[in-house]
């Protein structure tokens, strides 16, 4: 890097490509002050509708079997270019995975301890657009109107979570993906409903702030939500219905992960999730027991009681 310090870095690709470019930017930033160099201009052009990395100061990089989250203001691109024609050829399975990642970003930013009026407004719009347009993208990738709406939703979700951060769905998904190479969006989709239920205290009083906010999302989706519990129930059903519509796996056991290997590495994944940088802003503070049970629920796909 010292011999060919760039003036411009362009990242053209999916979230992993943009995150890799961010790692380069981060490495350059460590030497820039001593060398008296300007930070390179950074242009991000996403070719999937998923991470929203083109507008965030986050980068996820893999070190051995662990995914590490970098957070630094230098990682925020200077220019983001959104072109829905670049995502028209994305296959249905990847469209589903990345689209559920968008939904997860919105849900987690919305109930984050760092949420604000600004991130809430973005997250609410994202949730509405995902349920309205993701199925159309999955059925017909050449539907550029649906593609544009999902591409915009991905970007808006990135804007929401770069300001509000995320929660334990991402913490658990980072560990699951790092250990068993489950695609990130798919890992989020497998864990999302279980975390929603746990954050809402669904099997308890179901009257947490998170439960009430989830119920508001259900109301915005024109689903039954006369009480927090009814709203959370509606949202959980809507999430599962969306996954089923796109033929997504219901449980980790449907993804090819070996049961014995899963049990053997469960404690390792829980430890990774506990120290993940997304965990502190989760609306409900988890411990190892809770995360272990959430993984076990996600293994079978059944939402059960978890304290």
Model-derived features with residue positions:
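N-terminal small/polar loop signature for handling phosphorylated ligands or for N-terminal nucleophile
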Residues: 1-34, 136-147
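A glycine/threonine-rich phosphate-anchoring loop and its flanking beta-alpha core
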Residues: 26-117, 208-219
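Short, amphipathic C-terminal "tail helix"
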Residues: 261-307
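Gly/Pro-rich interdomain helix-loop hinge
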Residues: 182, 186-264, 304-305
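C-terminal and late-domain segments of enzyme folds
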Residues: 96-156, 160
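Short glycine/serine/threonine-rich phosphate/pyrophosphate-binding segments
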Residues: 16-23, 52-55, 169
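Glycine-rich phosphate/pyrophosphate-binding beta-alpha loops
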Residues: 50, 155-188, 275-281
């Amino acid at each position: 890097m010292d011999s060919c310090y760039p003036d411009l870095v362009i990242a053209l690709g999916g979230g992993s490509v943009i995150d890799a470019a961010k790692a380069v930017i981060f490495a350059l930033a460590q030497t820039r002050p001593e060398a008296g160099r300007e930070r390179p201009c950074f242009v991000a052009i996403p070719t999937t509708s998923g991470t929203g990395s083109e507008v965030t100061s986050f980068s996820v990089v893999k070190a051995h079997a662990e995914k590490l989250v970098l957070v630094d203001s230098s990682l925020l691109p200077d220019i983001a270019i959104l072109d829905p024609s670049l995502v028209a050829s994305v296959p249905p399975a990847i469209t589903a995975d990345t689209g559920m990642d968008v939904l997860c970003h919105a849900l987690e930013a919305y109930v984050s301890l760092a949420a604000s009026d600004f991130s809430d407004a973005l997250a609410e719009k994202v949730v509405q657009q995902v349920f309205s347009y993701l199925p159309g993208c999955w059925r017909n990738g050449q539907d550029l109107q649906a593609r544009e709406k999902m591409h915009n939703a991905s970007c808006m979700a990135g804007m929401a979570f770069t300001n509000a951060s995320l929660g334990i769905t991402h913490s658990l998904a980072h560990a699951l993906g790092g250990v068993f190479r489950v695609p990130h969006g798919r890992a989020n989709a497998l864990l999302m409903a279980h975390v929603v239920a746990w954050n809402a205290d669904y099997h308890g009083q179901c009257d947490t702030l998170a439960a009430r906010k989830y119920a508001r999302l259900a109301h915005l989706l024109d689903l039954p939500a006369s009480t927090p519990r009814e709203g959370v129930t509606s949202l959980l059903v809507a999430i599962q219905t969306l996954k089923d519509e796109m033929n997504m796996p219901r449980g980790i056991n449907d993804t090819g992960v070996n049961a014995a290997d899963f049990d053997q590495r469960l404690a390792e994944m829980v430890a990774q999730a506990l120290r993940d940088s997304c965990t502190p802003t989760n609306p409900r503070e988890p411990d190892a027991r809770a995360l272990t049970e959430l993984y076990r629920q996600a293994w079978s796909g059944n939402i059960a009681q978890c304290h």
